[in-house]
Amino acid sequence: SPGALEDEHNDNFLRF
């Protein structure tokens, strides 16, 4: 996701 940190699936905050 656009905004995910260097984590493959860290869309916990930019998942809008």
Curated annotation (Swiss-Prot):
<keyword id="KW-0527">Neuropeptide</keyword>
<comment type="function">
    <text>FMRFamides and FMRFamide-like peptides are neuropeptides.</text>
</comment>
<feature type="modified residue" description="Phenylalanine amide">
    <location>
        <position position="16"/>
    </location>
</feature>
<protein>
    <recommendedName>
        <fullName>Extended FMRFamide-12</fullName>
    </recommendedName>
</protein>
<keyword id="KW-0027">Amidation</keyword>
<dbReference type="GO" id="GO:0005576">
    <property type="term" value="C:extracellular region"/>
</dbReference>
<comment type="similarity">
    <text>Belongs to the FARP (FMRF amide related peptide) family.</text>
</comment>
<dbReference type="GO" id="GO:0007218">
    <property type="term" value="P:neuropeptide signaling pathway"/>
</dbReference>
<keyword id="KW-0964">Secreted</keyword>
